């Protein structure tokens, strides 16, 4: 079993690399493809703490959602911006990152988020006018309830230490979800007929816009809306490669709440 074998499976059966956005960086980002693999650690982020955990566990490979290398760099040193890359290289641990391709993929970030929130009749929100808006957002239905009650449910299901929400003046029935930073989809979601949008990384004026559009808006946190896919990804790797020991990283959200 090699790193390339794992990447081949992920590309063909989990999140095709061809789905990635043009600006993204995915696939095998660090290490040798021919490297033998016996232990894999799956994590949302490729941080120094994750590298240390992988090293302590004796892992040969780390599979992450967020890319270990995202912005172009002209050096890899112990500078804070590249030290994590150096940590992985010095530890001999390969890194595969599945980012926007996993956001868009069937049973990826957003399908798992929708399922975690108990949505029924989950569908991909499509646009006849703008291809760039297609394939990411998922919609589904919940039992009708008031927004504060649904927000409390989201907080509990995702393990949020806190969340923010704004009312569009409607009860919750048809819910759209976009894991991570999806503020750019607010108008698209409102036009779709959904009454509620669960996403993350929202600004003050995003909430104002949603209120004007009559859309309930919930910011449940970047980590919290994307991390559910990690357990799913680990389970799929374990089922496909029973000879591998697949572990889930213990790292959590770096954001703290008072």
Spans of model-derived segments:
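Hydrophobic structural segments
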Residues: 1-258
């Amino acid at each position: 079993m090699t790193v390339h074998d794992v990447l081949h499976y992920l590309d063909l059966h989990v999140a095709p690399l061809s789905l990635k956005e043009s600006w993204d960086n995915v696939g095998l980002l660090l290490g040798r493809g021919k490297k033998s693999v016996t232990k894999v650690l799956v994590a949302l982020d490729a941080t120094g703490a994750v590298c240390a955990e992988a090293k302590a566990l004796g892992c040969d490979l780390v599979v992450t959602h967020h890319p270990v290398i995202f912005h172009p760099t002209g050096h890899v040193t112990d500078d804070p911006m590249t030290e994590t890359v150096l940590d992985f290289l010095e530890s001999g641990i390969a890194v595969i990152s599945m980012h926007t391709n996993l956001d868009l993929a069937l049973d990826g970030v957003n399908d798992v988020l929708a399922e975690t929130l108990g949505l029924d009749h989950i569908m991909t929100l499509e646009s006849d006018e703008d291809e760039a808006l297609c394939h990411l957002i998922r919609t589904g239905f919940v039992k009708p309830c008031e927004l504060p009650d649904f927000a409390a449910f989201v907080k509990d299901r995702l393990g949020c230490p806190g969340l923010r929400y704004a009312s569009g003046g409607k009860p919750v029935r048809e819910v759209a979800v976009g894991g991570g930073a999806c503020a750019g989809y607010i108008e698209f979601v409102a036009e779709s007929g959904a009454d509620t949008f669960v996403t993350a990384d929202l600004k003050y004026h995003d909430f104002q816009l949603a209120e004007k559009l009559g859309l309930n808006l919930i910011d449940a946190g970047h980590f919290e809306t994307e991390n559910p896919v990690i357990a799913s990804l680990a389970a799929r790797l374990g089922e496909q490669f029973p000879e591998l020991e697949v572990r889930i990283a213990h790292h959590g959200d770096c954001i703290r709440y008072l």
